């Protein structure tokens, strides 16, 4: 630190004399200018930063060396199946550094609530504490079975994963929306709007629900059966205009939640039975994503983006379905407007996240896993399997927005890029100039 000390006393003639005389140098308490302070501070900070970078570089070299020799051996007990699915967490690449918090969980680890007619389980901030904006629920209904009439405090975005279902949702003005949906279709139920879901033939349905509250719990929704059970019979009779002995028979159980029932009539018959077009909702709450053309298609895969621009009722939740071919890369990017919650539909891949202060983490993902990326954190995803991998990118936002690193580099003057990356103009020209989203393997 001799250079730093010299810099600290360089502008002070008296201090120079003291230093040359060999006496102990003590900081002055008078006449110390702001310029002196800033000069000394910036030099010290630069030295500290250099020390930090050197230490990090040394850590990378140590990791590379350790992973090639006996240092990485583990003679103790291991959960071999788990390690097999997470090689990049067990032996991370040398570029990983520091801690960014949990970025992975799996629905296959979540407690499953099973009832006659189906089941449900969830991934929220209780098990993935970094995800404070969104919660995911995976639910199954057999043919005819209901997720009972209910409502809740969060918006509900959903994607059908399997089978067929009939959904209903009522607007506050009394208009009603009813529709049948199949695999790949979406729906959105606004917070506080009463709705229901019923499995259809031949084998019911399974779907992913995403709520715009990180601490949401599917066990805490407002249930029709509980409302009836805890309202006095006299009040129910007066409210519904029923005979006094009827309210006692209204609810089979205090909490239905999921329960079996007869299959419904046709969609046309259901719509006609409630008043047809006279009471039809002016808003469309389902979206046939399976019928839409890809928003972006490259040699490496495709992306379908659904947000408030093409599905207007999705004011708080935006989504992108990404399919990567083997070896393809979801390009290095970040999202300026929201953190990212992922659901892996098929295949397997690797995600790397790079944060500030040199923190970085790499994790492997498989079908039914949930991923998380902090807001504005740079990240990439690569297909590491021999088949296509597909995943959802979900955001608590009205629009899908991302910043492409390639796009940014090519919009800068070449001299600025060379100064940062130490490459010449011919190499810069090889970097894709437009946002690719997906780069082929």
Question: Where would I find each of the regions flagged by the language model?
Answer:
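N-terminal export signals
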Residues: 28-30, 36-57
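N-terminal secretory signal peptides
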Residues: 1-32, 58-59
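Glycine- and acidic-residue-biased ligand/ion/polar-headgroup-sensing regions
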Residues: 152-172, 335-356
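Mobile, glycine-rich extracellular loop/lid and propeptide segments
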Residues: 148, 157-160, 166-169, 178, ...
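A short, N-terminal "cap"/entry segment at the start of jelly-roll beta-barrel domains
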Residues: 59-135, 235-325, 331, 422-441
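Short acidic-glycine-tyrosine-enriched beta hairpin
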Residues: 172-190, 356-374
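Histidine-centered metal-chelating micro-motifs
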Residues: 145-148, 166, 185-187, 191-196, ...
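Ligand-binding loop in jelly-roll beta-barrel domains
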Residues: 191-218, 367, 375-401
């Amino acid at each position: 630190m001799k250079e730093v000390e010299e810099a600290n006393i360089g502008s002070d003639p008296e201090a120079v004399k003291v230093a040359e005389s060999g006496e102990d140098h003590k900081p002055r308490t008078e006449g110390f200018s702001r310029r002196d302070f800033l000069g000394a501070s910036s030099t010290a900070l630069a030295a500290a930063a250099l020390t930090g970078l050197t230490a990090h570089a040394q850590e990378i070299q140590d990791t590379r060396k350790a992973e090639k020799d006996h240092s990485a051996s583990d003679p103790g007990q291991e959960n071999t199946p788990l390690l097999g699915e997470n090689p990049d967490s067990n032996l991370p690449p040398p570029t990983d550094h520091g801690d960014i918090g949990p970025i992975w969980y799996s629905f296959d680890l979540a407690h499953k609530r099973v009832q006659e007619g189906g089941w449900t389980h969830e991934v929220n901030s209780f098990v993935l504490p970094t995800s404070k904006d969104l919660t995911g629920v995976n639910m199954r209904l057999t043919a005819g079975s209901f997720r009972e009439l209910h409502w809740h405090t969060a918006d509900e975005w959903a994607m059908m994963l399997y089978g067929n279902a009939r959904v209903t949702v009522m607007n506050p003005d009394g208009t009603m929306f009813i529709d049948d949906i199949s695999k790949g279709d979406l729906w959105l139920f606004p917070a506080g709007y009463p709705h229901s879901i019923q499995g259809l033939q031949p084998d019911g349905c399974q779907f992913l629900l995403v709520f715009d509250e990180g601490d949401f719990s599917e066990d805490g929704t407002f249930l029709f059966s509980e409302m009836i059970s805890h309202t006095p019979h006299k009040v129910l009779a007066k409210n519904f205009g029923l005979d006094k002995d009827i309210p006692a028979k209204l609810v089979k159980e205090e909490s239905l939640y999921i329960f079996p029932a007869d299959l419904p009539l046709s969609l046309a018959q259901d719509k006609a039975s409630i008043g047809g077009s006279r009471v039809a909702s002016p808003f469309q709450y389902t979206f046939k994503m399976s019928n839409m053309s890809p928003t972006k298609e490259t040699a490496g895969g495709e992306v379908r983006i659904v947000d408030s621009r093409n599905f207007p009722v999705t004011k708080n939740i935006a989504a992108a379905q990404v399919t990567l071919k083997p070896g393809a890369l979801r390009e290095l990017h970040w999202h300026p407007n929201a953190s990212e919650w992922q659901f892996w539909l098929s295949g397997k891949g690797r995600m790397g996240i790079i944060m500030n202060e040199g923190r970085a983490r790499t994790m492997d993902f498989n079908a039914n896993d949930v991923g998380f990326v902090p807001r504005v954190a740079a990240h990439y995803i690569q297909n590491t399997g021999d088949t296509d991998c597909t995943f959802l990118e979900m955001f608590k936002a009205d629009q899908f927005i991302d910043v492409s690193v390639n796009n940014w580099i090519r919009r800068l003057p070449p001299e600025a890029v060379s100064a940062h990356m130490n490459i010449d103009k011919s190499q810069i020209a090889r970097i894709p100039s437009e946002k690719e989203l997906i780069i082929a393997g």
